[in-house]
Amino acid sequence: MTTEEFEKKAESGKLILVDFFATWCGPCQMMTPIIEKIKEKYEKDEKAEVLTIDIDENPAIPARFSVMSVPSFVYIKDGKAVDTVIGATTEDNLVDRIEKLKK
């Protein structure tokens, strides 16, 4: 995903959960099936979307949100970070935050 594509989504009015990851990161690999499941759950949701950003492929996006470690999960609404989870976590934690923040 290019920075331009990301900006368009970030400014869309939807709540965006961004999974910042790296291919060399063990905890990131552990989170992949959880993120895929959440991504599928919100695929048709008009108020929320899940994106994954490889920090090595596009370092400008994580830099914008001061991402210093992976995995990091940043919730973005109207182009601004509204919540962050750093490190591996549970599906329930990520989904509960989506539901709370997308309203």
What are these regions (language model features)?
Residues I53-I61:
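Structural microenvironment flanking redox-active thiols in thiol-disulfide oxidoreductases
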Residues M1-L15, P59:
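A short beta-strand-turn-helix
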Residues Q29-K44:
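Typically the conserved alpha-helix immediately C-terminal to a functionally engaged Cys/Sec
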Residues V74-K103:
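Non-catalytic, surface beta->alpha helical segment in thiol-disulfide oxidoreductase systems
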Residues L17-V18, V50, F73:
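Hydrophobic beta-strand anchors of alpha/beta hydrolase catalytic cores
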Residues K14, F21-W24, S69:
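Short pre-active-site segment immediately N-terminal to redox-active cysteine/selenocysteine motifs
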Residues C25-C28, F73:
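The canonical Cys-X-X-Cys-His
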Residues F65-V74:
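Structural micro-motif
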